[in-house]
């Protein structure tokens, strides 16, 4: 009986020890994931973080996220000297984390590419519009600037998925606005004949722009 009691006591002590060890490893895995999340939050949202970068700096967001996930997991595992059980639990948590944030990084990179491209197109339209006005008296120069504006507008419209009707109307607005400003400049400079020539070309105008100049 004494030996049986001793055996039960030893078994009970072993069970308690196993449970304590399992709990310790579970807690180590939780600690590791806490450190992982803290480090990733800094890499994603801290100074110059993945989701803070703008424009061209954000084009590699997907690759940067992949590297950050891998490097951070290795750093945490090495820092805490996790055993196989704790590493497996950490890896499961990291996998769930990555299934949320990898697609987000891909989407962010795509959004930033489109935003950057749209900004370049708008800047091009503004610069060529300025060139058009600065060379108002040179017909060949005006044609050159307008041609560049049309190409730029077309690629902007295509990138943003404009329908043919929306694309046509949008370009008509750009063209009408450009010629309205051009006519205003002719009038201001006293070149009324040039202003009249523009007004008489019906294909250039949209809505009330033509009537405003005539008035």
Task: Enumerate the predicted regions with their spans.
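Non-transmembrane, interaction-prone alpha-helical and coil segments associated with secretion
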Residues: 1-215
